[in-house]
Amino acid sequence: MSRTIQVTFDAHDPETLSRFWAAALGYVNPPPPGRELEDGQDVFEAWHDFLREVGVPESQWNSSSAAQDPDGVGPRLFFQQVPEDKAAKNRVHLDLRAAPGLQGDERMAALETECERLVGLGATRVERHE
């Protein structure tokens, strides 16, 4: 029997990372428990309202955040705030497959398009590999 997994990341700013990864993967940031979002309502505003109502101090509102596959297929991503700086190279990274099945110029064009989209979301392009 397979198991459902959650991938957990340490972060300085969980909300920003979960926003980025939700947009990058086509995921969603889940609303607070028992809440449905009104049309156009920002999920993080809903979380802030919820946390205020249950008495969580504002200093702790960005202590964790999540992004999940709206179809329930991919793993949930959980971001937890940690005070320390990163001490070493990341031991986990996510590889996005932006051009499965494509080859040659068509593949590179699809990869460039995806790279531009991710940079627009806040990613940093390090280098290009052919």
PLM features per residue range, with description:
Residues V126-E130:
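Intrinsically disordered, low-complexity terminal/linker regions enriched in Pro/Ser/Gly
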